[in-house]
Design a protein with these regions (language model features):
Chain C
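Short helix-perturbing small/polar motifs within transmembrane alpha-helices
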Residues: 2-60, 75-167, 192-205, 209
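Non-cytosolic membrane-interface motifs at loop->transmembrane helix junctions
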Residues: 60-63, 105-109, 171-180
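C-terminal edge-of-domain segments
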Residues: 172, 183-186, 200-201, 205
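Short aromatic-rich membrane-water interface segments that cap or initiate transmembrane helices
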Residues: 67-75, 103, 174-183
Length: 294, 286, 215
């Protein structure tokens, strides 16, 4: 797979800030990958997301060094509106993303900006409505629906533009667990059915860990760790040092590993963890008396 | 229920069968009618007609309660302006003398004419606001090919107004949670304290501007450059069709206006001399 | 390679008024989506705040004893240049409409509102007054422009508009002139100074702040 994103020695310092928000970032993301980005607050995750979408430096004042390339071209080299055809961003606050009167208008807005025709819009509208389960909400004002529904609308609105890269900046931070799961269900479908490159910035790793192909750890503007997901979570001590809270099931098995009860691959999901525990218990269980019948 | 600019209208209302352009045309043209009608009875009849349209459209007539104090105060201001503050005019007929102030018949007549003119203008606007959803206004504007950026600014402004109102409630509740409430306090106190609301409201809106701009850019919207010249599909217009009935209504409104002008300037209708209301008022005051 | 570094020396607290309004050599200030958004937001805020004033303290025909919308009109124009002037011209039309002022009367008020928004914005830029109101001169410029612009509005609207529409007698025009003038100046005294003092320091750092007229 050819790289779709290439970041070379990239640093960004906002005007009036003493320290750079991102410092010396080098990163390559292959097309079609599902990448998770984690890090404590203030680590530069959102700055990175904005840098990939061209919002930095076009909308923010600061000092940039290095290069951010999308499909081999620097983000600043794209004319206004062109990069957004390739890179879509879903922000953490769905309320702040809505400028239309109805959910349908919200979904259609991006497609109209692309210059699509009415039949094309209709077709894509049907597709994203089905994907994100929004059929019953189309006539409603977007600010009158629930938080989870809002975030699905925001996701669908960006998806309707069929960007090659989708970036979701803490899409579930304001949602309850049920709504969070529904958003991730959409992401699961996207991963299975589409070939978008998906980058998710999240604090909550319960759902992200099982979906991501690769994980990135940012801290204080620096890229501390980048690896395939299983290998990423093997570096548990580094993650814990940097304030990352892996899923509880994963932490539990890690403790068993530290105690010497388990030495295989770290599980990413509760089901995998249950399988690990079953294996551990089976090994520890003393052999019982041979059963006899008759 | 469908939310209009001034409240809610049931989904079954006949007003939704009317194309938004017709509603806008009605507002623009019918607002002019009173300017050419001097006879108060005709203007009052127009006002009743508009109220009747509101009732037919199944608008919740309680929305009119907001305007009752304003209508009364405006009427008081007009009558005071014309009578008590009307000056000394020996050439006018004296209708009464109250506390040393001359009240002239011509001033009472003129005040009645002006007040009767204002009322249908106000209710034409109220009718429009109470039967038009935000989307309708956008569609009406797009139907007459007003540039997209203008209609979009208008839509965002409406959205912003809603958010400011929500923010106001939040800020007010936050202040109340700190034991700070304006209820039952004097006007100067309230004015001083509203300043404390304005600052966070402005600050919230400024922060929101950055988020809105990012959201627009993320959806590929551009104000300048090639992306701004993209031909837009105007998908929202596909939900509305300008039918023969709409054409008839538009024509009827236009013809009514033309007929009004012909009757007014060609045949002297709607003038004061022909007004039975003015004749009755004069008799009553004599 | 360093890019997009505004060469504004020092922290915003140390900037002079001259520096606030001056565009540095090489400084790029493109007109963008943010300005459209600011325009829309100012119209929205003004619509709510103006309608509050129109409904709460009415004299009649959109003239008010205490018009809170003046703050959005004038402070918005100082901060955001032509976008603020445009918003300040447009939003009273809507706030008056909701308050019951007839369509064509609201339309006829447009020149008055345009001048009320334009004059403070022009004066601050022309005289390089500090929007943070750091000196007596800044206060004086603001006060003077508030008075002059409201005086124009007060003459235009009752005299030209309301008298022209036949809604007022000649003798009652002074009441409405003073009502318009007083309603704007008093509300401006209450809100403009405090808003500028409290928020200008933040606003001038944002990309939406307009140094010239459009960006």
């Amino acid at each position: 797979m050819a790289p779709i994103i290439e970041i070379q020695n990239y640093s960004w310092r906002y005007s009036y800030a003493k320290m750079p928000a991102l410092n010396g970032i080098n990163l390559i993301i292959e097309e079609g990958a599902f990448v998770g980005i984690i890090g404590p607050n203030g680590s530069g995750k959102t700055t990175l997301a904005y840098s990939l979408d061209g919002l930095i430096p076009s909308q923010y004042r600061g000092i940039k060094q290095g290069a951010v390339n999308i499909l081999g071209r620097e983000v600043e080299a794209y004319p206004a509106g062109a990069l957004q055809k390739l890179v879509g961003v879903v922000f953490s606050d769905p309320e702040a993303q809505f400028t239309a009167m109805t959910v349908e208008d919200e979904l259609v807005f991006g497609m109209e900006n692309l210059g699509l025709s009415v039949p094309e819009i209709r077709e894509r509208l049907e597709w994203v409505t089905e994907l994100a389960e929004l059929g019953h909400l189309l006539e409603k004002p977007p600010y009158e629906i629930s938080g989870g529904q809002k975030q699905r609308v925001a996701l669908a609105a960006v998806l309707a533009m069929t960007p090659r890269v989708m970036i979701l900046d803490e899409p579930t931070s304001m949602l309850d667990p049920v709504s969070r799961k529904r958003v991730f269900d959409v992401l699961v479908r996207l991963k299975e059915e589409q070939r978008n490159t998906i980058i998710v910035i999240e604090h909550n790793l319960e759902n992200l860990a099982s979906l991501a192909d690769r994980m990135i750890l940012l801290s204080n503007g620096e890229l501390l760790l980048e690896d395939e997901t299983h290998a990423f979570f093997e570096k548990m001590d580094l993650l814990l040092e940097n304030g990352i809270h892996p899923p509880g099931a994963m932490l539990f098995i890690h403790r068993l590993m530290q105690e010497g009860y388990y030495a295989s691959r770290l599980p990413l999901t509760v089901d995998e963890a249950a399988a690990c525990l079953t294996e551990v218990v089976a090994r520890l269980k003393p052999p019982g008396p041979a059963s006899s019948r008759g | 229920m469908n939310k209009t600019l001034l409240g809610y209208v049931p989904e079954q209302s006949p007003i939704y069968a009317v194309h938004p352009f017709v509603k806008l045309f009605f507002l623009l043209v019918v607002s002019l009618f009173p300017m050419f009608i001097a006879s108060p009875e005709w203007n009052l009849a127009l006002m009743l007609f508009i109220l009747g349209l509101m009732w037919l459209s199944r608008v919740d007539m309680r929305v009119l309660r907001i305007y009752v104090p304003m209508v009364i105060s405006m009427g008081s201001v007009i009558f005071l302006s014309y009578t008590v503050l009307g000056g000394v005019h020996p050439e006018f007929g004296l209708a009464a003398r109250i506390a040393g102030v001359n009240i002239y018949w011509e001033r009472i007549r003129d005040a009645s004419v002006v007040y009767a003119r204002i009322l249908p203008m106000i209710f034409t606007m109220v009718f429009f606001l109470s039967t038009s959803r935000e989307r309708d206004v956008i569609v009406a504007m797009r139907s007459v090919r007003i540039p997209f950026v203008v209609t979009y600014v208008f839509a965002m402004a409406l959205r912003a107004a809603g958010m400011v109102l929500e923010d106001f409630q939040i800020v007010r509740q936050a202040e109340q949670a700190r034991g700070f409430d304006t209820a039952g306090k004097s006007i100067p106190y309230r004015i001083r304290k509203y300043v404390m609301y304005m600052i966070p409201l402005f600050a919230l809106s400024l922060r929101r501007s950055e988020e809105f701009a990012n959201a627009l850019l993320a959806r590929g919207y551009a104000f300048t450059g090639e992306a701004s010249r993209v031909k837009r599909a105007d998908y929202v217009l596909t939900h509305y069709s300008f039918r023969p009935a709409d054409l008839l209504l538009t024509a009827a409104i236009g013809l009514a206006f033309a007929a009004l002008l012909v009757l007014r300037f060609g045949f002297g209708y709607f003038e004061l001399e022909r007004s039975w209301f003015i004749a009755w008022l004069k008799t009553a005051l004599d | 390679m360093a890019t997009h570094a505004p060469s504004i020396p020092g922290a915003p607290g140390k900037m002079t008024a001259e520096q606030i309004w001056s565009v540095e050599a090489g400084e790029r200030r493109p007109v963008g989506v943010i300005h459209i958004v600011i325009l829309a937001l100012l119209i929205g805020i003004g619509f709510v705040v103006g309608a509050f004033g129109s409904i709460s303290f009415p004299l009649g025909f959109g003239v008010n004893f205490f018009w809170t919308g003046i703050a959005v009109q004038q402070v918005g124009a100082i901060w955001f240049g032509a976008w603020g002037v445009l918003a300040g011209t447009i939003f009273p039309f809507f706030s008056n409409a909701v308050a019951g002022t007839p369509f064509y009367i609201s339309l006829a008020y447009v020149p008055a509102n345009a001048v009320q928004a334009f004059l403070p914005a022009w004066a601050f830029r022309f005289f390089k007054a500090d929007p943070r109101l750091q000196s007596g001169r800044d206060y004086l410029i603001l006060l003077a422009t508030m008075i002059v612009s409201s005086a124009f509005g007060a003459l235009w609207s009752p005299l030209v508009v309301l008298r022209g529409f036949g809604l007022l007698t000649t003798e009652s025009v002074p009441l409405f002139i003073w009502g318009w003038f007083g309603g704007n100046v008093i509300a401006g005294l209450v809100f403009n100074f405090i808003l500028l003092k409290a928020l200008s320091g933040v606003v001038i750092r944002t990309p939406s702040f307009v140094k010239r007229w459009l960006s």
